[in-house]
Amino acid sequence: MSLLANDEVYDIVSGFKKVIESAKANFCESVDVAINLNINSSKSDEQVRGAVVLPKGLGREVKVAVFAKGGHLDAAKEAMADIVGDEELIEEIKRKKCKLDVDWCLTTPDFMSSVSSIAKILGPRGLMPNPKFNTVTFELSKAIKVIKSGQIRFKSDKAGIVHAKIGNVKFSIEDLLQNFNAVIGAIKQSKPASVKGVYFKDVFIVSTMGKSVKVESLNN
């Protein structure tokens, strides 16, 4: 991630203005935040992960797949899940006959063992249902509604950086700021107990094709 000239640091509102003004692609660029945390990501107890609902959404449709059986399938369909299926769907995925083009996968606790058979397919894509994200639940309708309203997941990488989408360049600065604050709040709540002192080292915002913009420290 390259910085703008002289590594200039902006206040968050000016930073968003710079990112939006610099977006010149012939498509609607996403706006992302990258947060460098003061953590040792090699330690399992210092990995930061979680999920948060963006109050202003993502600016695009969030797609959901549901693995379940019986009445739970009907509930998922009524809740407008994009892909719904049972063991047959799992077999299609194993045979690569189903393109799972979704953002989230959900299942019910009693069907989790079946979904585990495709963990090697879902896991690398970050799609494996996880109780921590409320994607293993009997309350599928509620979970689908929350996710489609703009829920995202976040996870620190090997360098201790959290990347998250917070909208696109057509969003107002006020809407981007609300989403940004929601992500920051969720990351603060996920702060490992072992981390002392400064938590946020550097914060950058960037559009899909633009240069990153460094914004002021969040530790003040």
UniProtKB/Swiss-Prot annotation:
<dbReference type="GO" id="GO:0000049">
    <property type="term" value="F:tRNA binding"/>
</dbReference>
<dbReference type="GO" id="GO:0003735">
    <property type="term" value="F:structural constituent of ribosome"/>
</dbReference>
<comment type="function">
    <text>Protein L1 is also a translational repressor protein, it controls the translation of the L11 operon by binding to its mRNA.</text>
</comment>
<dbReference type="InterPro" id="IPR005878">
    <property type="entry name" value="Ribosom_uL1_bac-type"/>
</dbReference>
<dbReference type="InterPro" id="IPR023674">
    <property type="entry name" value="Ribosomal_uL1-like"/>
</dbReference>
<dbReference type="InterPro" id="IPR023673">
    <property type="entry name" value="Ribosomal_uL1_CS"/>
</dbReference>
<comment type="subunit">
    <text>Part of the 50S ribosomal subunit.</text>
</comment>
<keyword id="KW-0678">Repressor</keyword>
<dbReference type="GO" id="GO:0015934">
    <property type="term" value="C:large ribosomal subunit"/>
</dbReference>
<keyword id="KW-0820">tRNA-binding</keyword>
<dbReference type="GO" id="GO:0006417">
    <property type="term" value="P:regulation of translation"/>
</dbReference>
<dbReference type="InterPro" id="IPR016095">
    <property type="entry name" value="Ribosomal_uL1_3-a/b-sand"/>
</dbReference>
<keyword id="KW-0687">Ribonucleoprotein</keyword>
<keyword id="KW-0694">RNA-binding</keyword>
<keyword id="KW-0689">Ribosomal protein</keyword>
<dbReference type="GO" id="GO:0006412">
    <property type="term" value="P:translation"/>
</dbReference>
<comment type="function">
    <text>Binds directly to 23S rRNA. The L1 stalk is quite mobile in the ribosome, and is involved in E site tRNA release.</text>
</comment>
<protein>
    <recommendedName>
        <fullName>Large ribosomal subunit protein uL1</fullName>
    </recommendedName>
</protein>
<dbReference type="InterPro" id="IPR028364">
    <property type="entry name" value="Ribosomal_uL1/biogenesis"/>
</dbReference>
<dbReference type="GO" id="GO:0019843">
    <property type="term" value="F:rRNA binding"/>
</dbReference>
<dbReference type="Pfam" id="PF00687">
    <property type="entry name" value="Ribosomal_L1"/>
</dbReference>
<comment type="similarity">
    <text>Belongs to the universal ribosomal protein uL1 family.</text>
</comment>
<dbReference type="InterPro" id="IPR002143">
    <property type="entry name" value="Ribosomal_uL1"/>
</dbReference>
<keyword id="KW-0810">Translation regulation</keyword>
<keyword id="KW-0699">rRNA-binding</keyword>
